[in-house]
Curated annotation (Swiss-Prot):
GO terms for biological process: glutathione derivative biosynthetic process; glutathione metabolic process; hepoxilin biosynthetic process; prostaglandin metabolic process. Its EC number is 2.5.1.18. This is Glutathione S-transferase Mu 1. It comes from the Eukaryota. Pfam families: GST_C, GST_N. It comes from Bos taurus. The gene is GSTM1.
């Protein structure tokens, strides 16, 4: 039985999950829900199913794997990662994984906040000014390691890749001063399964956000 991943028909919070499912060669199917156009942004496609799936906290994304039904994007990532020993092995690695998972969410939410704001154009210059400092912290945390937890790939590499790529789309030169992050991105995109997925018709590079967003909605 394939796992079922449910999410909007956008990149959003499912990007790292899709990448991890592909990397681990997991048998899965997607249920993608669409949102209507302005001004109503009709969500009935999802709302009609929302409370019929047996989810404890009905939301998107969700993952159904037999009797296991999960929501919350990071819980889903961890569930898949545990099956493939991608959560870090030593205490040091697991600490790095835990810190980074939460740091990435903070950075992602800060970006989403301005991209969904009607004051986007007013907020954009201030946001652009903050990007180098945010990116620098990731660069220093990675250091000379190949992956963010250490020598081995973990699920947080999928999260960091996603958030760095989003910032790269927003400001194409934002990684230029950080060669170790550019190398990390090349290393990640060069993984055999990831590279094959990115060339496939299943790959969904965008839109980054929903139609309600001011930026990243196409």
């Amino acid at each position: 039985m394939p796992m079922i991943l449910g999410y909007w028909d956008i990149r959003g919070l499912a990007h790292a999950i899709r990448l991890l499912l592909e990397y681990t060669d997991t048998n899965y199917e997607e249920r993608q829900y669409s949102v209507g156009d302005a001004p109503d942004y009709d969500r009935s496609q999802w709302l009609n199913e929302k409370f019929k799936l047996g989810l404890d906290f009905p939301n998107l994304p969700y993952l159904i794997d037999g009797t296991h039904k999960l929501t919350q994007s990071n819980a889903i990532l961890r569930y898949i990662a545990r099956k493939h020993n991608l959560c870090g092995e030593t205490e040091e690695e697991m600490i790095r994984v835990d810190i980074l998972e939460n740091q990435v969410m903070d950075v992602r939410l800060a970006m989403a906040r301005i991209c969904y704001s009607p004051d986007f154009e007013k907020l954009k210059p201030g946001f652009l000014k903050e990007i180098p400092e945010k990116i620098k912290l990731f660069s220093e945390f990675l250091g000379k390691r190949p992956w963010f937890a250490g020598d081995k790939l973990t699920y947080v590499d999928f999260l960091v890749y996603d958030v760095l790529d989003m910032h790269r789309i927003f400001e194409p030169k934002c990684l230029d001063a950080f060669p170790n992050l550019k190398d990390f991105i090349s290393r990640f995109e060069g993984l055999k399964k990831i590279s094959a997925y990115m060339k496939s018709s299943r790959f969904l590079p965008g839109p980054l956000f929903m139609k309600l967003a001011v930026w990243g909605n196409k």
